[in-house]
Amino acid sequence: MGLAENGKSGQSKYERMDSDFVEGENLHLPEKTNNKGTRKYVLACAIFASLNSVLLGYDVGVMSGAIIFIKEDLNITEVQEEVLVGILSIISLLGSLAGGKTSDAIGRKWTMAFAAIIFQTGAGIMTLAPSFTILMVGRLLAGIGIGFGVMIAPVYIAEISPSIERGALTSFPEIFINFGILLGYVSNYAFSRLPVHVNWRVMLGVGILPSVFLIFALIIIPESPRWLVMQNRIVEAKSVLLKTIESEREVEERLAEIQLAAGHSNSENHEERAVWQELLSPSPGVKRMLITGCGIQCFQQITGIDATVYYSPTIFRDAGIKSNSELLGATIGVGCTKTLFILVAIFLIDRVGRKPLLYLSTIGMTTCLFGLGLTLSFMGNSPFGVKLAIFWVCGNVAFFSVGLGPINWVLTSEIFPLRLRAQASALGAVGSRVSSGVIAMTFLSVSRAITVGGTFFVFAVISSLAVVFVYKCVPETKGKSLEQIEMLFQSDGQWRGRQGDEVELGDTENLVQKE
């Protein structure tokens, strides 16, 4: 797998990635900067694009409490409860799979709008559902909308962000997921005292509001410059880059780099193989990208974070809390912790790097999950056991939020080359959603078989395997452009856990083979 050739006759099939820049560098144009408002503009775009992520977070948070009242109002069974909770993650894979093709066809921006409209429809149906069957129909639609949203937001943000700030900005969707979870917990507590046939409907209906704001926000934000280059709309792409990058010289260099990566100078080179064929029959470099991207997405979920968040009332009830109001109050503490530590990650991700934070996250989660298993197994139904269980749950979500939570979205959106980015990110999102759905749809059944404490021992073992995966399969990508990261995966040595290998801007002179 490699970048496209320049397409000049008589040239070798090996090309310097920076060969298209040389003439521009010799012009010695005076450099202009337009830093006034640039950072604020990029920040605003990242925030608006992340509003779809609030939908997923809100659903996770609100369903943990709403399900208590849905069970009472609609008289659903435990199996129906598991299906209702977990089906959204499973069905969202349809949106994630379709999201790659859709975003390449209509653009990143309008794919986000499409996602918001589908979710609004589903949320409206859930709010008015008179039966379990109608509730499931609404949940299926909401899941498809969320699948589109969680796939496209990180891609869009990565493609408009300057390299130096991309890590922090691309983690915004995870921040907004956490914010949505907290809003869901607060909504549960705030409306829990309404009549049982009304409270859960209000809880679910409030989730429509973020998607309404997103539709208005799309009037403001621009299309992705990389998508515009793929559509041969170079002038528009440059206009967007001028708004998001401070240096005019860097704008010219970045535009040339994007054109080269997109195969704009010789577009027929990338028509030789369909994108999905390349993903399903990958070269060694693409295979490494898929292992890293899809692997980190799956580990994010199979370490049990959604079980902790969706079923936190069940966990706290097993620890000894009895009343619904106390259960929902304890979940607010979990939501606050999760949101606080995701903000910590934003400040560290481009300073410390991706890999050190992943080590901290996975090792910390392993410790907390093991501690929670011990507490629920041997100290349940005691005042000290309740406090300790809350401590371990909050610790687990804190370590998750400081590393594995945001960084998996950052890595998935930045490691794939432009021509594969949308579809590969969709595959990563599919892995995440399927894993999440399986965990959510089996947690109660597994807990009944091996106890809640035993289930968290299993999660602790899986989390320890995530530490090994980070060491073996995740390279450091801090400070590299999206196009430079592609080169990083061409080197087997650099991919296999060597943090000291840095790809500088000048390293684009490395030779890349065209397949």
Predicted stretch roles:
Residues 2-246, 253-256, 262-515:
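Alpha-helical transmembrane bundle of multi-pass membrane proteins
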